[in-house]
Amino acid sequence: MLKAKILFVGPCESGKTVLANFLTESSDITEYSPTQGVRILEFENPHVTSNNKGTGCEFELWDCGGDAKFESCWPALMKDAHGVVIVFNADIPSHRKEMEMWYSCFVQQPSLQDTQCMLIAHHKPGSGDDKGSLSLSPPLNKLKLVHSNLEDDPEEIRMEFIKYLKSIINSMSESRDREEMSIMT
């Protein structure tokens, strides 16, 4: 059974924990409390299997605290990560400015492929859902960008996340198959 490690990273108060709980069908948190370090959520998704072989997959979603005081822990968090989801609050201009730093630290430095990264522009309840005005600079504009609004259209983000998980598992499965073939030849 394949097991994938996915990091949820991004600025403080971007909605990482709320999204992580929703996408893993974990408990709801009604009051804001900053994540201290990391919170690991383990889950399975019946819609995601390994290369259509029917083999189940397990996931670890690492909900990483966005405070810079945890920066010294980031290398340990990144170890053996298969994917990174950068979550930001699209309504806060400073979050947009921080995006390149998160991308550099969690995607470029550990040499992950852009396909292993997804951006989520999270819109908090009551903030509106302005999908049209978000322009990102290179290299962020090459990444998959999904808008989330759990109040208006929660299933859209769930479906996009399942697609993302499938792409991560397919990549892992192909890599494992290549490794097995190289051993046999």
UniProtKB/Swiss-Prot annotation:
Keyword Metal-binding set for record: no
Keywords in alphabetical order: Cell projection, Cilium, GTP-binding, Nucleotide-binding, Phosphoprotein
Family matches, as Pfam families: Roc
GO cellular component: centrosome; ciliary tip; cilium; endomembrane system; intraciliary transport particle B
Modified sites of kind Phosphoserine: 137
Entries under InterPro entries matching the protein: P-loop_NTPase (IPR027417)
Binding site for GTP: 10-17, 63-67, 123-126
Subcellular location: Cell projection, Cilium
GO terms for MF: GTP binding; GTPase activity
Main localization (coarse): other
GO biological process: cilium assembly; intracellular protein transport; intraciliary anterograde transport
Superkingdom of source: Eukaryota
Gene3D superfamilies per record: P-loop containing nucleotide triphosphate hydrolases (3.40.50.300)
Family membership noted in the UniProt record: Belongs to the small GTPase superfamily. Rab family.
Subunit (UniProt): Component of the IFT complex B, at least composed of IFT20, IFT22, IFT25, IFT27, IFT46, IFT52, TRAF3IP1/IFT54, IFT57, IFT74, IFT80, IFT81, and IFT88. Interacts with IFT88. Interacts with CFAP61.
PANTHER family: DRAB5-RELATED (PTHR24073)
Biological role: Small GTPase-like component of the intraflagellar transport (IFT) complex B.
Protein's UniProt name: Intraflagellar transport protein 22 homolog
